[in-house]
Structure formats: C-alpha cells, structure tokens
C-alpha cells in the first residue's frame, strides 16, 4: 500500500487551517499528522563528515573545501558556521576533520590545519580552543587516541614536516586539552593500553599498573625503515625512560618490524613483518602485560591482506586474504577468548583491493553474522581478472555454520561493505531485529543500480521480503518504528518513502525538488524521529540538506501492550537459541502498533538474558592447547609437565588438564551441564624424554645424489614473522635436476622430474619464492618454499647471461621484469624487456634492444619511486648502437633519457651508480650518482685517477651511507689490483681509502664487511706491486679498518698457535710488516656466501690464513677465530676449514676443507673449547658447508663427494639434542644468567665509543646450556653520543692519509674550491675552508674534536646575515683576549717555579687522534704545562697577530670547538627516531650527520 503525502512545508496556510480545525475537535490533544515535516537548507559546499551527538538533535558537518564546520541544534532545520562564539576564535576556514569522542557522547574535537584545535564537552554548544605545536597526522587514520576509562585522557597524533620529510610525533593530555604535553616522536603512532571501555572493565585488577600505560610504535635503534620498527611502552609518559621499555611480544622477547596496532573490545592486536617475507605475525594481549602470538593454523596472514572486522567480549573476528593473485577473497576466522587461537569460519569471503570485507554482525544481537562469499572461487584463483559471482550467507551461531538468505523461498544476495552506498552501518542498527539491504534474488549478486531492490527483515535475517523495487538508501529511527528510504539508482528523485510497520507498507512524501541522494542518516543509536538527507540538485547546482521530522506522525505514546518480547536468535527448530550460556530477548514495539516511543526515545534498547545449561559449545581450548584437526579435542601446543614425583616410568599416569576451559564471560548453568574442563588422566610417556647430552645427542643423516656435480643451491628460509618450522633448500644439479628438502637435507625429493632446468633465481625481497628457469618459454616457480609449483609462459627466451633474466619489485610482490632474446637464431641477438603485474600472466613490452631493465622502487625513495624503471637501452634499438639510460614512471608510455651515453648502471643500497664514457678522455669512464632516481650528479675523485673502460671497476657493498668502489690499475691476468675509493654520504665525492687492493680475474675483490658490525672491513692488498708489474706473483697482506675505511692497519697476530707454540716472526701481539695475521679473502671462496662473520652472531668471526709477512697457500694455512669484532684473533685449528654459525653463534662448527674427513669440530662456548663429532663411517671430501643464511638453525649441511667412489652426498648434522631449554632474557635489564651485554669498540678508542655512540648487544653466556631460539637481532640499546675523536674523521676530497695518520693535500692537486658550496646552495649563509678532514657519514659524535670546520666565510650576498649570525658584544671580545693571556701567564709562572726544567718532546699519536707528550722528567704535571708555556711564548712573540686572530674568533670568523650547534641526538630515543631520507641531498659536503646505519646483510658485490 503506497500513499502520496502532501509536502506540508510548501502550503503553510493550509497547514495552519488544518491544525486549528484538529485542535478544536480534539480539545487541545496532540494531533496525528499525515506525513513528516521536511525543511530544506541549500549550501554551496559539500556537507562532509556528518556527525550527530548521541541522544540529541545536534548535528555537525564539515566543508573540506572551505575548512568550515556547520552546526544545527534542531536536527538540521537551522544551520550556522561555528567560529563566532567564545572559544571558537580562528575556527573559520581552518578545520580539517571532526572527530567525536569514541566513548563519551558529550565530547567532540575539531582539528585545524595550523596547530589550533577545538574541543566541546557539552555536545557542541560551546567550544574551547587549544593548541598543539603540530598539524594532525596525514599518515595515521586515528589522529586522536582515546582512553577507555577516563575520557579526559587523549593522545594527539601529529606531524612536523620539513622540505625533506615529515616526522610523526605524539602529544597527550590528562584534562581534556586544558594542558598538553609532548609524548614522543614515533613511527606509526601511540595509543593507550586501556584503549576501550571493555578493556578497562576486563583489567580492573591491573588498573593501577596500566592505567597510564602508553604504547608507541617507534623507529629501530639502528635502522630507520619499517623492518626495524619496535613497540615500546611507558607508565610515566616516557619521563623516567626516554626510549621506553620494549614490549615482549613473542615468548617473552621483543619483536622487530611492527607495522600496525589496533584495540578491539578487550584486546590489543599488533602486527609485525620481517624482511624477506610478506607474512605477518599477529600478537594479542588482553591485559597489556602478557602477549601471545595469534595462531591461524596453516593459514598465513600477509601485509595489507588481513582485516580486523570487530569482535565481542569473548572473541575477535579477522578476515585473512586467501588468494595470492587477487586481493578479492579471504577466509573468516574467529578467535578464542584470549585472542590467540583462531578458528576458520568460512572461506572465500568477498574483499576489495582496499581490504574492505563483505562482513557485518547484526548489531545488538549476539552471534548473527552476514557475509558475502565468492561462489566461483576456483575460476577467480586461476584468472586474476575473472568476474566474481558473489552470494550472501548468514550465520546464527557465531560463525560456526552458515546458510543462504531467503526471500519467499528464493536465495537472496545483498550488496555489502565493498559496495555500500551510504554512511554508517550497512544492514542493521540498534533497532532490535530490523535489517535492510539492497540486492536481488537468483544465483548470485548482480548490478546495484540495474538489478538491485530493497529488502527488509524484522527477525534479524531469518526471513526477508521485498520492501521497494529499485535500489534505495535507507535509515531506521525510533528503535525500528520508522524506516526511511530514497531511491538510489543514479537518477534524480523528488520523493522519499517511509514505513511505520517494519517495512510491510510504505508511504511517500514529496521533496521541494529533485536531487541525487548523497547520504541519509540519523542519530547513531537509531532512537530519534529526525533524519538528515543530503543530495545534489542538478537544477540549482547546490547541495540540498533536508531535515525530516516524524514526531507528529502518531498522536500517542506506546503503552506496555504495544510491546512484545522478541527472541533475538532462533535455532533450526524456530526456538530461542543459546549462545555464551544464555538466550537473548528484546522488548520491542510491535510492527502494527500506531504509536511512537517517546518517553525513552533516546535510550538505546537493552537486551534481557536467560541462562542455559552448559554444552560443549560453551567451552574452548585452554592456554597452551590447540584444537585437533577434526576440531573435537584440545591437544597440547607445548610439552606438558607432570607434577613433581608423579611420573616414575612411562607406564604411569598423572592428573592433568583436559585442555578445555569454560569461555570467560560465559553464563551457562554448570549444574547438570557439560564439564569438559575437569582434569583427566594423562600418560607419563607424553612428558618423559631422554635428557640432553654431549656429542651423543648430535645426529647425522647421509643422502646420495645422482649427478656429477652440485650446480647451485639456495635456502628458502622463513623470516622472523613467518610461521613454520621447515628449513627448505632447493638444489640444482649439473644434469638439470631439481631437488627439494624441507628438513635441511635429511630427505630430498626430485621435483618436476620431466623438466631440465638451467638456473634458479630467488626473489631477493621474498624468501618464500624461487623461479626455476628452462631453455624454453615455459617457466616454473614456487611462492611457498617449494610446497607447490606453478608455471607461466615467458614472453621471450631466457637471457644467456646468468642472473639477468628476471627482475623483481621491492614493494609489489607480483611485479616482474623479464629480459631476454626473442626467437634468437644467431649469437648477437637483441634482448627485449617485458613486465607483468601478475607474476607471469599478461606480459607487456617495456623496451626493445636493451641490456637490462630494473625496478628502482625503494622505501628510502618514497612512493614516488614505486613505478620508476631504469633501462640500459641501445640507441635506435640497434644492437650495435650506443647505450643510453632511459627512465620511466609509467611503464614507458612516456620516458626520459637523462644520460644519453652510458656503460652500465647498478644499485648499491640507497645509491644508483651509472658508469659512462668520459667525454674528455678516450677509453676512460666517469660515474654519475643518484639517490632519488631523478636527480643525477657527477662523481668526483680526489686523486689523479683515470678509470679505464678496459680495466674496469667493481662496485662493492654499500651499507653505511657511502659507496665503496674498486678501480682497477692492473688488469693483467692473475696480476690484478687497484684502488679502493670511498664516497661521501650522497655518493658524489670519492677519496682514496686503501691502495693496491687485490682483485680476481672475474672482477671480484678481496673486500668484506664484517656483518652485523658498523664500519669493520677486511681487505687484502698486494704488497709487491712493482714486482707484479714485471710479472711476479702477487704477495697479499690483510688489512682491517674499524672506522669504515678512514684508517687501515694490519691485523694483530696471536701470540701463540693452537698448540701453545709461539710464531717464528716473534711478534708480541702487535702487527708489524714482518709479523701479522693474513686471511684468505672473498676472491678465493668456492661459495661467496661463506663470509667471515654472521649478522646474528655479533662480534664472532672466522678466517683461514697464517701469521707472517704475507699470505701463504691454503694448504699451509690454519683456522683463526675472533670474538671481539676482529680486534684480536686466536688460532683454533691447524689446517683450512669451512665454518658455520648455529643458533646465532651458540654453536660453532668446523669441517676440514680440501682433504678427506669423517668428523667435524664444534664449540658451544664461543670457541674456548672444541669437541669432535664423527658423522660418517666413510670419509668424504667436503665441497661446501652450509646452514640457513640467518645462522639461527641447529642443523647444518655438508655437501661432499665420497672418497674413493666420487658419489655426491649431502650430510645433515642435527645439534638440536644438545640442549633442552630456551634461554631466558630480561630485556629490561639486558642481562640474566643466560645472557651478558657485549659492546663493540675501536681498538684505538676508549669507552667503547664507535662512530660516536655506544652500542650494546645481547650475547649468550657461553656457560649456559640453552638455545637462543631467536630470529631477531640482539640489539639491546644504543646509548649516549660520544665526543668526536680523530677516528670520527676521514680524509676530505683531494686529500690522502699520511704515514703518521694525518691527512694532507695530494701533491699536484689544488685545494677544493669551497665557495662552490654557495653556488650549489643559494640559501647558504656561509662556507668553510677545507681542513683536509670530513666526518665519516655514519658517525653521530658531538662536541670533542672538530676537524672539519675551522674557518668560515660569508657566502656572496649573505654578508649581513653572516654578521648577524656571528656577531658578539665588546665584553665577549675583551674576555676572549684577556682571560686566556692571564691564565697562560699564571700557569707559566707556576710551572717555572715548580718544575725541574727538563723539556719533553711532542709527537702526533694514534690513539683517539690526540697529541701525546713524553718527557724524560719526573714531574707529574709536565703534560699540561708544556702546552701552556708554548702558548704563552707564542702569545708574546706574535701578540699583534694574536689580537687579530682573537678578534676574528670572537666575531665568528674562527669556528670555536664545541660550538657545532645542538646535539643531533640528545637521547637514545632521538637517535632511534631519526629518519634516513636522503632524497634531497645535493652534490656537496652535507654529510647528514648522525643518520642510522641500515645494514643490508645480503648486499653482494656488483661487478662490471
């Protein structure tokens, strides 16, 4: 039944007459009207972010275009702009966002653009201005974080931006912004531990402990990127401890890579992601004290691929993406009561690219969930662009079972969250049982506008009926008494429709004019009779705001007889159903009652509960138990422990937990119900096991491989956040067979047996992925560590150059570049590059006739680099054409050629290095450098150096914000060597670091950074270059640097060998030209992955070499070991050995190299003692020795050939039986019985300062019999910044190191033209004269020695600014002159009267860059007075010059030591939060002092 209602506001005279008539007939009673009152307000701006104050008619909206906030006190009848009242100053045109308080309906906040913000505590009637010295964060969605118990406590998330980057920062208030205090800088925000009312209610016993607790996601201690983000907390707003305490998320230990955190009901959830995987680890707590990792069974969750949907007070619901090729489907999980174990509810849920999921629980009714799923999921999984067929399902038992929606016995499908056309909730409101949706009946969901109709249910989704044809926007009011709808098919409409009987019948009311509806809304609790409709009028080109009021529609208030007791949930028999131990009922208005609820209008409906007897559904698995695969039992997740004395033999039993517990909060009646949580008898055999032992606890497994040789192998190692225990290796043999092991070589499987493979290519950004290339076009790959294999058709043949076929994207995991020849029939074939966004599906051409193309995306370059591609292309697409650098940001729809002549380009950490011909010198080349991929700068060399295109260069590891490069001087076969040069922080200015560095015929260099340590490098140099030039063999010596190449020394030899004998060269432990330790380096390794050191075994290093004048052959070498970062070494075994680190260095293993053996040596006490383990009865010759790249495994693998038979064998060594417990660490103190703190240091510096700061690491106590079982780095802290010393500087451009350690100008070269700095930096006020020194890029030192800035001059045109900056008063000048002279004279007189008259001699020392004074006299005061006397005499002799110099000093021309400005890091927290953004660094000497080091532990050498 549909009636047309007259639009009353268009006929006021008629309305007046009608009211008078009714009034006279009823004697003044409230009269019933025939329709709603509708008032119109037209505005020029878009009404955004509409917000009702709950239980009121006060509504706000924002005009984002003008920054104005509009307010109405009468449900939208009258509007005015806020900004003219008291406390509203400055609000006009400054608003960015309106934020209601989540838990206090009287409060809301308006955030401004420029630091001024406003708060109301009386539902919008008055506003108070407050200021925060930061703009609202644009990165974080939640700009305000509310306390769940005290609504006065709020955290404000802001940002402070410079031209380079924005820094997220947090502030807090405890009194509704009456006062505001800084909290800390942060990476991804701060939040209250008590972040929800439900959390506050469930943690009352911890209220005092966590009431003020704040948690923050902050930057790493050494690494500014997301992989190192940490979760820290403080109970004192970081006043007692500026960095805070790191939260122990995983088994009592911190976790790195925190990317997100969220509070839901009584839970806090934190997501973490490690480098090398897209899998996330989710950690959950329900008390902010104890954390657990959430378990999703065999399902993995990925970044951007999970959505926390909501939850109850007893569970969390999470949707996890379940397809790798498409973002379009997921799996719905529900947790147990503590949020740790998740149960799969339904698969193939419908998702969109933004992560929204078609899921909504029916508000106010426990256990009813409505979801959309993809019916043709198999097709969608196979084809990324397949059209989805979506169907709707509903659950009435908390997601345990699902069934179709039914409308007149037909399946109904409704549009949900991913296609929602209004604001607020999609289907339901607090009105009990009333549910609406737009959809269609049939086999699957169809078009919203073409096929959609409005359907309604008044029994919480059990049955549905057609309400209105065509799609409509809809809202519910007065607890379900009124439903309002407006057609929403894209065409203008001039009417609304409403129902007052649960959608059975509909009436119509006319609008003033037609609009295209934008949104329809009412109060959040759906209790009001007033609605707000906003739409756009195409006729007036304005926005129309309609206030719709139904208060006069019924003349009476509902009585008791107008209500019914409505059961919120029914079982399959139609009876009230139990959930969480009770049945739920609502008292709601009958659908045909002709009344409105006015007395309790603004009261949200509350349910009534009736208890049920306990059933199996009221129980869940207890702590440390998980569901069995058939879901019928709870089995132990960790080994059980029997009561002391209970188990004497395996045949005994003991009383133990059943594995079940009653769900916390469950109200079921225990008497007469199920009791699954009663203790049960458990067998002792489940808890008894053999005790750990010595070498007998080690096991070995031998496997024979049918092939002539191992061709290559790679570990597909799980990263820290990846769940699983497998240790997978993929191996290719010389005959093209592919073998896979998932248990570190204990068993092997021959995969894809009918295919011959040529090459394995790993994705360097995702450890789970590997590609297996053939000579054909069909290629194979795995995305799950070789559990399964898939294939694609390549667009061209494989590139004949190894490693050049496939390129991968750092951020978008399915983006790839393929470079290879097409239909090549001759030798010199052109190669083309193609790209795909779908992991091999849908290849498109990038460029033809290329050498290579690469993605340039990198986190440090920002989102601007996500689509950036570099190609080295032949000019005119001719194979013989000149090479040129071509770049594009749109897959070469458009392109640029920044460098028309190049040789090659390569990536090295944050740098892009391009080699190009030198236009001024034939056969020579130069380098260009870029950090952002857009701006290029010429590289300059500080020595008389010509880089020959014929001789070549090698680009080395770059992990300390500078580039190391080897430039070849001699390219004769077996006689190659060259110069090691090092850049400044932007890669443009190179200085000599070390001469005569050894290079192999293949272009590799004896250069290696000790992993995990800052600035420690080992290199081999050719000591007899003159003889080598004449054809003699090279003699190599090993050099080491502890300050990133600024100073090099020989390695100190041990005093005695492993047998306790002294060395023939007679050294006392100090290195000399005749006696030092020399190590075989990178160029001699069979496997370049066998590095000296391990990033996880901090400070431990192995090497094979000898003590003497130079390096001898491996046949005469021994194996040496260092436990202090290469400062001191000892011989541990005679002969050459392979080595590996296990469990982060708690197990060290050696096996003989180059000779038959059947045993290994191992140490569990950092190399102090060694034991022997025999792994085989037969001897083998070891070809390689390996373990997982992170060195965290307890398994090792020997790759060998059996002696006498030439059979290939692999031998697994399993050390896991050596110990039976995990080490305990107290992160707060950093130490425990199982751990001690270790600090790296420089051998010539005191106080363990290294690069301006002191680092602390956890190292396992060698005496503790436990396992680290930790995949994260062991950094404990990075403490105070140290004063600058000589070791914090290196030689500047055009300067070189002298024999005494100082830096001097290279003979024949001019001083750098320092004034060029002003030209390159037009806003610069001053420049500094060259001193010969520059700060090492990674140092963070402050104060102390100032070797790089002595004398400054004003830049042209900035004289006045310079004088203002350095101007001083006359008093300062006076004291600057008089006081030093007075002190010098007085001190000189005292020395003259007390000293014995014996002068000493001054020499330049090597320790700390200080001058040391030695004296033959016995006076203890001589070290100071000598300098003072020298100063006094000098002052007398050159007094006129002194006055001039002092004048310049006082007026700023001479830079005073210690006046470098504010400390770059005042605290550890400031150090940790520094951003590593180099995008806008120009070609100058700006060293970006103090930036954190970012270790790329897998940075292999690039060579050309």
Swiss-Prot record:
The keyword Signal applies. GO terms for cellular component: cytosol; Golgi apparatus; membrane. Glycans are attached at residues 313, 338, 986, 998, 1281. Residues 1485-1504 are annotated as: Disordered. It is a multi-pass membrane protein. Residues 1392-1423 are cytoplasmic. Keywords: Glycoprotein, Golgi apparatus, Membrane, Protein transport, Receptor, Repeat, Signal, Transmembrane, Transmembrane helix, Transport. Coiled coil: none annotated. Residues 1-31 form the signal peptide. The keyword Nucleus does not apply. The chain crosses the membrane at residues 1371-1391, 1424-1444. Its main location: Golgi. BNR repeats lie at residues 70-80, 118-128, 394-403, 455-465, 739-749, 1120-1130, 1161-1171. InterPro entries: Sortilin_C (IPR031777), Sortilin_N (IPR031778), VPS10 (IPR006581), VPS10-sortilin (IPR050310), WD40/YVTN_repeat-like_dom_sf (IPR015943). It is found in: Golgi apparatus, trans-Golgi network membrane; Prevacuolar compartment membrane. One of its GO terms (biological process) is protein targeting to vacuole. Residues 32-1370, 1445-1504 are lumenal. Functions as a sorting receptor in the Golgi compartment required for the intracellular sorting and delivery of soluble vacuolar proteins, like carboxypeptidase Y (CPY) and proteinase A. Executes multiple rounds of sorting by cycling between the late Golgi and a prevacuolar endosome-like compartment. PANTHER family: SORTILIN RELATED, SORTILIN-RELATED RECEPTOR. Belongs to the VPS10-related sortilin family. This is Vacuolar protein sorting/targeting protein 10. It comes from Talaromyces marneffei (strain ATCC 18224 / CBS 334.59 / QM 7333) (Penicillium marneffei). The lineage of its organism: Eukaryota, Fungi, Dikarya, Ascomycota, Pezizomycotina.
